[in-house]
Amino acid sequence: MKISRATTLAIALMGASAWAASYTESLLALHKTLVEADSTTKAEAPSTQALKTYLETNFTVELKTVEGSRQNVYAYPGSGRAARVLLTSHIDTVPPYIPYSRAGDEIRGRGASDAKGSVAAQITAVEALLASGEVGEGDVALLYVVGEESGGEGMRAANGLGLAWDAVIFGEPTENSLVRAHKGVLGFNITADGVAGHSGYPEYGRSAIDLLIGALERLLDVPLPSTEEFGNTTLNIGVIEGGIASNVIAESAAGRASIRAATEDLEGIKGILSKAVAEVTPEYVDLVFTGQGLPVSLDYDIEGFNTTVVNYYTDVPQLNGTHKRYLYGPGSILVAHSADEKITVSDLELAVEGYKKLILESLKK
């Protein structure tokens, strides 16, 4: 019978169950505190303050302003800011806020998986290693950023710390697998220009909504590049707006979309989409591309983990440096951003052990 590396890791970690039981209560309490703190993107202050209050017991804590009242949290044991290994994740979440709830092994709430599960497990792992004496000052530091869900402004601001690390362990819901690579991203806004009028006389107006629908239908049909590693490039139309009343020909309409790119040729994707829109509506529709990022390759040279490739984009490329880049965390991306976002207690516990292993192995390199 063939046993997966993840199963092997889980079996090996059963020997640590007594120790795990000693931190499970504090792990779950921290996770609950974080999920209960509404930290919707652009309004992350409750989570920032909750983290600061918690971390000040065992760490030196620095709050770094990103913009306005939005702040990143940087923490480290002792007085030395520099560390060989950094653990990081994001504290912002997508709307709407969903309150914390627990039933047995399952915990629900906004951010339970993406990514407050990673935050709680990372902190607990570092605390456990500090308590056992396996790591100390100068070995590890923690960084928790705002704005990951809105383009990565928090992680970009973290470059202002002026620090470098040998390895950075990024926390996202990966089902406790090490990620080998993740897709790129490309956003666009599309607008349609109509002429308002009475709905009973459509021949005297021009419906921006009709124009927008025609363009979007074409964009959804057009073939986009695929690769063996990442599969298909995908397009999601996330927002549509337009019109003022059902009996008025819509004067304007707009949409916003996100593309998960399987190729580095983002300019090629832009060309395909622009041509498709022009073929359907050569006038009155405008396509403007917004934020973008290339696919990212990651490190996965630590034994004992299953590995995977994921379709989402992360903060990984926003942090400058020559460090090794590991992406790992509890929870599933398939429930992230959904009304049923959840995580299990056992997944959180396994993540603590996984993070401990990643830290210790990184310190050996």
Identify the function of each model-found stretch.
Residues 120-187, 227-228:
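Acidic/histidine-rich catalytic neighborhood of metal-dependent amide-processing enzymes
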